[in-house]
Amino acid sequence: MTYANRLTGLLAIRHPVLLAPMDRVAGGALAAAVSRAGGLGLIGGGYGDAAWLEREWAAAGNARVGCGFITWSLAAQPALLDRVLARRPAAVMLSFGDPHPFAPAIAAAGAKLICQVQTVEQAREAVAAGADILVVQGTEAGGHGLTRPLFALLPEVVDACPQVPVVAAGGIADGRGLAAALALGAEGVMMGTRFYAAQEALAHPAAKQRIVEARGADTVRSTVFDIVRGHAWPAPYTGRVLRNAFVQRWLGREDDLARNLDAIAGDYVAARDCGDFDIAAVVAGEACGLIHDIPPAAEIVERVVAQAARLRRAGDGPAPAGA
């Protein structure tokens, strides 16, 4: 079954499946694998490590991929966007900030501007700035976000911004999520946590295994890991991660953590580097309860698309569990 719609047409892809540009996890090999499977892979530009980005673009080879940035961080080093645009990306995704300053350059380079939003107001502002595609992120998503559940927010944005295709993100890990998102007016999905547990993802193997073993209820929204990593995220954003001993110790005691940071930050970095995820963060969304293996990224795309197609053919009938 084909999924020809505005999204697939704009991005010249076969399947309406996008890789979330996860910082330090969505590298070139993962992005390329998703794109070669018929979706669109986005390299995680994150906080703007130029040397890392250069390496990962090289790792993508000749695959047609895009890149995503944390907008407020990109604003502090705008020249990084020029370096990415010189690579002729299929799309650039901006999240968590004002896209207006960057939209003209992205359009001039021939890339599509994808804006991730968490409110209807942000969606309208993004369209006014020139967004070609909106990603509506629900609170179920891993990493940073706000508080609105996806399936309440999604149709609101679809109704408010009919002039652009909308992509659903947050809590989606299989074809049931894709089928449900399409039913609510989205034209595709973006998945992060599901691809975090892909063979090509740059995450530590122990972190991937934690996702496989976790349930959706094992995640929590917090600022604990932003504080210990020294990332000054603007309010009211918080980050969803798997619960572990470190977050349990400091949740609700963020001021104490900040006061003791000099004594704690070094141990956190050491834990991250050695794969101790009782201390280091595993950034994951509530979809982890639907993830039970670590397959190649192409297999994930194929499963999601095939299961959604079975659901669409079956109408209201249930589909087998799993992707």
Regions found by a protein language model. Give the residues of each.
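Active-site entrance/lid segments in N-terminal catalytic domains of soluble metabolic enzymes
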Residues: 1-165
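Residue-level detector of alpha-helix initiation sites
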Residues: 25, 172-173
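Conserved acidic functional residues
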Residues: 116, 170-171
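Conserved active-site-proximal phosphate/metal-binding subdomains
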Residues: 149-167, 173-323
